[in-house]
Amino acid sequence: MGPRKKSAKVCVMDSEVAEEMTADEEKDYMNQLSHEVLCHIFRYLPLQDIMCMECLSRKLKEAVTLYLRVVRVVDLCAGRWWEYMPSGFTDSSFLTLLKKMPDVEQLYGLHPRYLERRRVRGQEAFSIPGVLEALQACPNLVGVETSHLELVESIWTYMPHVHILGKFRNRNGAFPIPPENKLKIPIGAKIQTLHLVGVNVPEIPCIPMLRHLYMKWVRLTKPQPFKDFLCISLRTFVMRNCAGPTNSLKYVPLVTGLASARNLEHLEMVRVPFLGGLIQHVVEDSWRSGGFRNLHTIVLGACKNALEVDLGYLIITAARRLHEVRIQPSLTKDGVFSALKMAELEFPQFETLHLGYVDEFLLQSRMANADLVKYGLADVVENPGIITDIGMKAVNEVFSCIKYLAIYNCPHLHNPYNWISDHSRWMRLVDINLVRCHALKLDSFGQFVELLPSLEFISLDQMFREPPKGCARVGLSAGTGIGVSSALVSNQNSNNDNDNNAPNNNANLHDNNHHHPDDSDDDNDFRPDLQAGEAQFAADALNEMEDMVQEDGELVAESGNGMPAHNREVLPVDADEEQAGPSGLQRVVKPTPIADHDSESDDEEDSLELQEVWAPKNGTRRYSEREEKTGDSGQSRETAVSGKGKTPLRKRCNNSHQTGQAKPFPLEESSCEKGCQVTSEQIKADMKAARDVSEKKKSKDVYPSCSSSSSSTAASTAGNASSPSTASQSPDFARTVTSSGSSEPSPPEVDVSRQCVCSPGGSEDSEAMEEGDAESSVCPRCCCLRPQESQRRTGRCSDEERPSTSRACVVNGADGTRSAFSFRTLPQGGSSGPAHDERTNGSGCGATGEDRRGSSQPESCDVQSNEDYPRRPLTRARSRLSHVPLISESEVAKTKPCHAMKRKRTADKSTSTSDPVIEDDHVQVLVLKSKNLVGVTMTNCGITDLVLKDCPKMMFIHATRCRVLKHLKVENAPIVNRFDYAQCKKLNMDQVLDQILRMPPERNRIIYLRPMQQVDTLTLEQKLFSGPYPYHICIIHEFSNPPNVRNKVRIRNWMDTIANINQELIKYEFFLEATRTEEDLKKYPKYPWGREIYTLEGVVDGAPYSMISDFPWLRSLRTAEPNSFARYDFEDDEESTIYAPRRKGQLSADICMETIGEEISEMRQMKRGIFQRVVAIFIHYCDVNGEPVEDDYI
């Protein structure tokens, strides 16, 4: 306030008063102060500033001399222990300085940047002998703080009475351990804290004063380095990745010495190969006398020989004060916590548990275990922790007060929901951090989060990841190598049809909710009005699938009303060239196809070359079954359970001409094919079918070929219907099959080639085809071609306009009930399925169930020429969507046969992970519902959609390198205000921004984006400023590379200032509040859309930025002169950031309003409204070329 009064004195004065003022200003007030006052002032100044005052005046020089003569504590680094002391010292100057301080007792900050080992005659330098000489010139010296290895060893040698103050921490540590870093510790050294990093030490002797010993990358050179180890005052012992003796017996003195430290609080041993069971025996001997009783932190990591009893005894002994435990993977077992549970102990202060703990150095080091062993570290190969859901339930029963839980790489954890029991409620859990738990199920995790009453923070790293391409087809568990042969695994997970069971193929996985799907078809066998989609569920239940199917994701065979709500809203995703879907997969409810015969062996192909000209890769089984059913209904059960594997038999269709209606076939034979993997039951059926193959060959004829190679290529898709070109060769009539299985003739004037014969009852298409995919428009269920205009939905939003969380495909049942199915977006080169007639106004080729049953003339689809067929086989991702063919096989048999052609081999078989397929990203929706959740952080996760269902306290979302994260849906999260999306390759930026800006304006919001694709800035700005968003909007385009965070960090300071001014004006000055209703949007259809938009540009640290905004007041505040409250201790100004309010003195809304008073009056006269809240969107363009830029701040 002083400077403010001074500025208020500015007025007209006569010359005499001005001369008096000048005389007063020229007075030297410092020289008028007494020596005592000056010495008191010097106590608050750094030594460097005090020494600079010597040359200012004689009185100040006297005061400095007097101060140095009486000073007892000197800090050469002015309290900044991490810095180096001032440079420029030599031996003589340092000696002169210390001679001026005869009474100094404690010398802090003796951190020279460089010291010579010895003096050089005739040359001024700063050397170790010179420093020792200067220290010895201080007779009262008690202690010195330093970080120099050779200097501290010299002090111990030549000045043993001097204490080493503070924390000794050498600053030249590295790995591999530099040979020049050496330190010999004498017995009884006067030091309390010793931190050694990358040092060669002969031994750790008896040091009674030592309280904290920290050793990292220390090489212990003596054969018995702990022979004399005894530190009775020790409170902290940390030994990480040290190169010590390999003989486990040589660590016995170490553990016994630690037991004698009765005040030991922190015990951390990483890669220490002590003898297994040693700690157990030492605890048994010492616990009565207080050994390990006061531990509050226990860390065991990569200790090769450590046993469960060692850890258990430590935990039990320290139960009263234990705060934190970090457990290495080999000890992360159910048995540890079961035993602790039986001990019936209480842990009143316990808060933090880290399971599967792996040291940071081992995680970040690129060295293999052999390289580490070469440098002297212990030979340890860690396997993942084997704790299961049963063990996790026991964790909370043991540690009921746990607040922070971290789990690393525990692949046998599946259902977090099962961690909760009557005795395990996780009532106090505040923070959960999951890393690489690849089998954890997403839906179960969401349910677990919902039941945690105190949870505030979630951190997910490498969770719910997508498997490599093809892993889903060969039964591999994503990225872990845990899996079984594809010949033994049922493919419930065909291509993108991943569910929660597929990755969990380990025999030792604990899950008590197994069931077989055989019980789901009882009500459907005799329902003739069953829809095709429902029939598939019933048919799938008759096939032997995986031996473990989870209850929580059970496929419901009856009407859609029986499905849980979270399954009804399963979300499709965009067509993409990469597969997403991790090991712990969310249940996606789909029409599950039945088994097909997928023959890929060369021998069988040669033998069946002439018999199978039209041989679709995925689905000829249905034809053979139905033809056999027509010829002999008694064979239906034999053909219903047929195998599929590496080289199963491919069944061929009968060519007998049927004159009457086909007999109704069982429902289990009317579904889509399943995939490419087999069960043991199906293998047995294959063997039986092989014995009868000669009989069946007699009753089967050749399938007619398609008219061209391109047709045959397209035919290798689903195989559920004949190809369009085949159908078009007999345009007389076609038969449509009702849901009961009978066929009806259609009028002969309807061209079969123009019909879509695949559509299940009323199912709508999953997503519109990409507009760029004009080269082929293929119906996914029958491969009939449709024109592009019929593919594009007229009544639906595009993917950019509408998140996948709001789209669900609905199949109308016969009784009006609804069943939810999630159909994938089709790969490029295919097309989306037939659209629901409500959505396409009749332009699609699908019909409702009632239409199909009651009408003899199904809706038709237009056809394009054959050259528009895709030039590659359509994938299983397409073929699994195929339904029952509606053309009778008798009509297929009447078509003209073409010349036999050997089918083109592709790698699309069950044992290949290099298939020539384009797979969609697996839809994985993380639904968060929590009363206390504050923030979620996701890194390298395979989640595609994030839904904030009910998070009233949520404040931030951070997503980094989430490759398939696309959408955000906010249902109820009113105060979330910070969004950070960095290097998320497939993020739908328009949809995310729209969701955030549509939230009610209860908070200012800031959005950080680092896109990995080009951004159309003009379109983006138009959408944001013209949209119905009741915020002032600021878009900042940052082009620094490598990334500069200066602007990003500073935005938060001044965006709130703008909002605070607006709120003051609206609440207390009765300023007009702006709105963005539909009427406002119609009123301002063109630029600037009712906003006052302006642009600011500049350069920060050599990188340009551009800001387009309608923030009021900002331009005036930026250009205003600094006021009396200006703070110049702040590092930023207008040249280094967009706006620096502290440099201007604009510290509050009231001060700012004084500055912009005129502009406020003008706005009031213009009756221009303002919004109460603001949104800042910061877009960093360093990654837009698709290559992520390394960034320490990310």
Swiss-Prot record:
<keyword id="KW-1064">Adaptive immunity</keyword>
<dbReference type="GO" id="GO:0002250">
    <property type="term" value="P:adaptive immune response"/>
</dbReference>
<feature type="region of interest" description="Disordered">
    <location>
        <begin position="896"/>
        <end position="915"/>
    </location>
</feature>
<feature type="modified residue" description="Phosphoserine">
    <location>
        <position position="746"/>
    </location>
</feature>
<keyword id="KW-0833">Ubl conjugation pathway</keyword>
<comment type="pathway">
    <text>Protein modification; protein ubiquitination.</text>
</comment>
<dbReference type="GO" id="GO:0002842">
    <property type="term" value="P:positive regulation of T cell mediated immune response to tumor cell"/>
</dbReference>
<feature type="compositionally biased region" description="Basic residues">
    <location>
        <begin position="896"/>
        <end position="906"/>
    </location>
</feature>
<comment type="subunit">
    <text>Part of the SCF (SKP1-CUL1-F-box) E3 ubiquitin-protein ligase complex SCF(FBXO38) composed of CUL1, SKP1, RBX1 and FBXO38. Interacts with KLF7. Interacts with PDCD1/PD-1.</text>
</comment>
<feature type="short sequence motif" description="Nuclear localization signal">
    <location>
        <begin position="902"/>
        <end position="905"/>
    </location>
</feature>
<feature type="modified residue" description="Phosphothreonine">
    <location>
        <position position="592"/>
    </location>
</feature>
<keyword id="KW-0963">Cytoplasm</keyword>
<feature type="compositionally biased region" description="Basic and acidic residues">
    <location>
        <begin position="622"/>
        <end position="631"/>
    </location>
</feature>
<keyword id="KW-0597">Phosphoprotein</keyword>
<feature type="modified residue" description="Phosphoserine">
    <location>
        <position position="742"/>
    </location>
</feature>
<keyword id="KW-0391">Immunity</keyword>
<protein>
    <recommendedName>
        <fullName>F-box only protein 38</fullName>
    </recommendedName>
</protein>
<feature type="compositionally biased region" description="Polar residues">
    <location>
        <begin position="855"/>
        <end position="867"/>
    </location>
</feature>
<dbReference type="GO" id="GO:0070936">
    <property type="term" value="P:protein K48-linked ubiquitination"/>
</dbReference>
<dbReference type="InterPro" id="IPR032675">
    <property type="entry name" value="LRR_dom_sf"/>
</dbReference>
<dbReference type="InterPro" id="IPR042354">
    <property type="entry name" value="FBX38"/>
</dbReference>
<dbReference type="GO" id="GO:0031146">
    <property type="term" value="P:SCF-dependent proteasomal ubiquitin-dependent protein catabolic process"/>
</dbReference>
<feature type="compositionally biased region" description="Acidic residues">
    <location>
        <begin position="599"/>
        <end position="609"/>
    </location>
</feature>
<feature type="short sequence motif" description="Nuclear export signal 1">
    <location>
        <begin position="194"/>
        <end position="201"/>
    </location>
</feature>
<comment type="function">
    <text>Substrate recognition component of a SCF (SKP1-CUL1-F-box protein) E3 ubiquitin-protein ligase complex which mediates the ubiquitination and subsequent proteasomal degradation of PDCD1/PD-1, thereby regulating T-cells-mediated immunity. Required for anti-tumor activity of T-cells by promoting the degradation of PDCD1/PD-1; the PDCD1-mediated inhibitory pathway being exploited by tumors to attenuate anti-tumor immunity and facilitate tumor survival. May indirectly stimulate the activity of transcription factor KLF7, a regulator of neuronal differentiation, without promoting KLF7 ubiquitination.</text>
</comment>
<feature type="compositionally biased region" description="Acidic residues">
    <location>
        <begin position="764"/>
        <end position="774"/>
    </location>
</feature>
<feature type="domain" description="F-box">
    <location>
        <begin position="30"/>
        <end position="75"/>
    </location>
</feature>
<feature type="region of interest" description="Disordered">
    <location>
        <begin position="487"/>
        <end position="529"/>
    </location>
</feature>
<feature type="compositionally biased region" description="Basic and acidic residues">
    <location>
        <begin position="793"/>
        <end position="804"/>
    </location>
</feature>
<feature type="modified residue" description="Phosphoserine">
    <location>
        <position position="601"/>
    </location>
</feature>
<dbReference type="Pfam" id="PF00646">
    <property type="entry name" value="F-box"/>
</dbReference>
<feature type="region of interest" description="Disordered">
    <location>
        <begin position="793"/>
        <end position="879"/>
    </location>
</feature>
<feature type="region of interest" description="Interaction with KLF7">
    <location>
        <begin position="59"/>
        <end position="119"/>
    </location>
</feature>
<feature type="modified residue" description="Phosphoserine">
    <location>
        <position position="607"/>
    </location>
</feature>
<dbReference type="GO" id="GO:0005634">
    <property type="term" value="C:nucleus"/>
</dbReference>
<dbReference type="GO" id="GO:0050870">
    <property type="term" value="P:positive regulation of T cell activation"/>
</dbReference>
<feature type="short sequence motif" description="Nuclear export signal 2">
    <location>
        <begin position="307"/>
        <end position="316"/>
    </location>
</feature>
<feature type="compositionally biased region" description="Low complexity">
    <location>
        <begin position="705"/>
        <end position="728"/>
    </location>
</feature>
<keyword id="KW-0539">Nucleus</keyword>
<feature type="modified residue" description="Phosphoserine">
    <location>
        <position position="599"/>
    </location>
</feature>
<dbReference type="GO" id="GO:1990756">
    <property type="term" value="F:ubiquitin-like ligase-substrate adaptor activity"/>
</dbReference>
<dbReference type="GO" id="GO:0005737">
    <property type="term" value="C:cytoplasm"/>
</dbReference>
